[in-house]
Amino acid sequence: MDNIKKLGLTALAGSMVATAAHSAELSASGSWALSYTSEDDDAVNGQAFTMGDSVTFTGSGELDNGFTASVKYELDGGNFDDEQLKLDMGDMGEFAYGESNSGYGIDIASNMVPAVDTAIYSAVGTDTVSYGVARSAQDTGNLGYKLALDGGLTVSVEAARNTSAGGTDNTYGVTYTGIDGMTLAAGTGMTATGGTAEVESTTFGVKYATGGFTFGLQLTDVETEGSTEDEDGVHMGVTYNVNDDFTVGYVRQETDFSGNSSDEEHSGIQASYSMGSISFSGRVSKVDNMAGTAGSSDEDKHITMSIAF
């Protein structure tokens, strides 16, 4: 009986060693960031001061065939909300799967407009939808593929299937960087997450950098099945690098609703400044006619201090 026990313990120890040999080490990273936001007196948005509260765990390894496999988990506010598995196959492109799996399909083409702080359509306001912006596939169960070709051409596709409520999302994107200083982009997609009405997005963008200036323009059409309120978005912006430490920018977006709604208008100025390991970024933004509702407006002033260590 003792010999049988010893044999069992030896086998168990061997299996544990074998498992450990195939495990990947994860590194953890976080950030030091303190933000302050001031909005309209009638806005109720909780605490004005906030801090960065996310920790990202990453790991990667190279396979015998030269491919690189990587994994990422983000712990945000005490919850794991962003996970991604990626397989980089070199000249054959890369696959990625996970939640909040951005950067594939129409995402690579949906915003060519430069910003110093954040995209203007997400800077201010209480909209739960960024109107006039291309819809990408849902976060959960998102499968993406991207391939960089010779000559500066990159193509990408993403897909997601909601198995509980039905609905399939498929989007596609392409960018071209073969002209010095210029990026051209186009994307299209059909999203129907959760079995709701299908939403068709089509977008075209251009970005051009010369000297310290970067200019961007994005034209987007969003059509929702069964709705008369289709969206035509015009998004533009310019940034200027005054020097290596100081950058300023102006951004604007206008969304025309094809029905009787008023045009939604976002605008703002942004700036960033760094001195050694300390950096600041901020914005002053406003939105008029939120979600097409005449007279519904909001403004905000926001600044973030970050320390790298």
Where are these regions (language model features)?
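Outer-membrane beta-barrel proteins
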Residues: 1-309
